[in-house]
Amino acid sequence: MSVESVKKIFEDNNLPLKVEETEGDTATVKTAAATWGVEEDQIAKTMGYKLKSGEYILILTKGGARVDNKKFKDKFKEKATMIPHDEVLEATGHPIGGVCPFGLKRPLRVYLDKTLKEFEIVYPAGGSDHSAVKVPVDMLEGITQGEWVDVCKNPVPAE
């Protein structure tokens, strides 16, 4: 059902995007990158957060990025709290490992971390733990109605 909801949203909106499915596991950044033959940071990791108000939000980051608690608190005026595992499917309509900003069960605010802008193409999940969507980064804001933010930790420079 989840992959089908993603496919339907693309078809209904005449979007030139396709859900790619595989037998391989794509539930984690590492396995998704290996399956799709791309670098880990090109996997657009979708993380769900639950605000104190009870509202669920999604934040997309590059695969290796980590949310910076201070930046999150500055943006959302509260501590970062992930959606509890037992609420993910109900909140998004997608299972853990397949959460993406497309074909959601209900409208959710979507935030796109600036780390994604390092790439021309990224690969968010496609609604299951064995799917992905190849998406040009310059399309993300429009198709997700997302807001660009800076909530990830700055990378540590190589020595």
For each feature predicted by the language model, list its residue ranges:
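Extended, low-hydrophobicity, polar/charged segments
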Residues: 1-159
